[in-house]
Amino acid sequence: MTSIYPTTSVEKYAYLKYTAHITVATGRTSEALSLEGIKTISDILSKLDKKYPGFKELFMPTGGIFNSKTGIHVKRVGKPTLPISDEKQEIEDGDLLLFW
């Protein structure tokens, strides 16, 4: 049975900020990223790697261990900014991610 009420989907986003050498890799200082099909930081890195080839390897070289010369921090509404050290860290709508 179809609904008589219109269905609307509200797209979810994470907001990305780039600093230092990451701005050189992306050519940007910030952007919004749709979270459609994205659940973890690993998913975000994979999506950004398609857009900016080599991006994922800047943060997680082959072997799956985060690079100690770069970093990713997440800021959630009402919570302190925290570093991400687990590629399975879940990303939420409205998260602000800082890549350096």
Predicted segments with their positions:
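Ubiquitin-like/PB1-type beta-grasp interaction modules and other compact soluble beta-rich domains
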Residues: 1-100
